Amino acid sequence: MKQSANATAKRSRTVVVLAIAVVLILLGSILAQTFNTSFYNVKVSRISFETDSGTLSGLLYLPKNVDASTPHPAIVTTHGYLNSAEMQDETAIEMSRRGYVVLALDMYDHGHSRGNAENTGGFFNFWPTSLWDAAQYMYQQDYVAKDAQGNGQIAVSGHSMGGFSSEMALYLDETNYASTGYRII
């Protein structure tokens, strides 16, 4: 009888500890979401869009006061090799808190993005156009600011391999400028 009382008490303690752990996990998740959205001043959503080279996806950080009537400058940022958009969370949160529209991008064949092999090239050729394609997408959004001449107010940023993609995006933007007369980036 004494052994069964000890087993019951032990089981009760286990249930209490488990319940406390679940409550702490839920509170931690709510707190993390609160910080991730800058105390709900930034809407964070996963978006995806089609390009000639495949499907790009990323996390869009949209400050609360941004819409077509009040467009804001944008920043497209991307990760290094073997990473995904979530790697840029801290940077994206800080930039969006300061009023920038931020797209933290998954490059082709990373995270939720998929490239078409015939359009992105062969092995390891996913990075040259990822950021450029995303900048073109952001330029088309009515909540992204443009100057009086139609130039986009979009910055690009990347970590490691994403830095190479940023350089390539700037090169492609200059090539585009030569034929269109306006800059996207």
Sequence positions of predicted segments:
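Conserved alpha/beta-hydrolase
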Residues: 96-114
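Short glycine-enriched nucleophile-adjacent loop
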Residues: 163-176
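A conserved short beta-strand
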Residues: 176-185
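Alpha/beta-hydrolase fold nucleophile elbow
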Residues: 144-160
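The serine-hydrolase catalytic nucleophile loop
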Residues: 82-93, 107
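Alpha/beta-hydrolase active-site loop
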Residues: 87, 121-145
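N-terminal cap/lid segment of alpha/beta-hydrolase-fold proteins
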Residues: 30-70
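Short beta-strand element of the alpha/beta-hydrolase
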Residues: 69-80
